Design a protein with these regions (language model features):
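Glycine/aspartate-rich loop-and-adjacent alpha/beta segment that forms the canonical ThDP
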Residues: 60, 64-127
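Thiamine diphosphate
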Residues: 1-72
């Protein structure tokens, strides 16, 4: 339905429509390239006649600026390029299986709690 809605909004010249699509290169079962490579999303969306632009999802000012992009007569799709372990490098070793995090042991849970809280400069969660 997403593609149909996009196609219809282009067909009808709907330009008060904009959406943010998270592009984090992963699916539940692993990396997009391993599970189901979807190709160049920006090129596909633009080929429908919409305007797709890429921005750094971790840069709030870039996200705000993207919303102002001229897209008269067509919808705007903001492709927010994100890292699922941004600000939590301890999780990087689990990439691309980060859709959910299961701890292998109580020791790993405690280690992750401490490392992530240190990196984020917050107090660890007390269990």
């Amino acid at each position: 339905q997403i593609w149909e809605a996009l196609q219809a909004s282009v067909h009808h010249g709907i330009d008060n429509l904009w959406a943010i699509m998270d592009v984090n290169s992963q699916q539940v079962d692993g990396a997009m390239s391993d599970v189901m490579d979807v190709g160049d999303i920006q090129k596909k969306i633009n080929s429908f006649g919409a305007l797709a632009i890429e921005v750094d999802a971790h840069d709030i000012n870039a996200m705000r600026q993207a919303r102002k992009e001229n897209h008269e007569g067509r919808p705007l799709i903001i492709l927010a390029i994100s890292s699922p372990y941004q600000g939590m490098t301890f999780l990087k070793k689990r990439f691309p299986r980060l859709h959910y995090v299961r701890f292998n042991s109580e020791e790993e849970r405690k280690e992750m709690n401490i490392k992530i809280s240190n990196e984020l400069r917050i107090e660890p969660i007390q269990y």
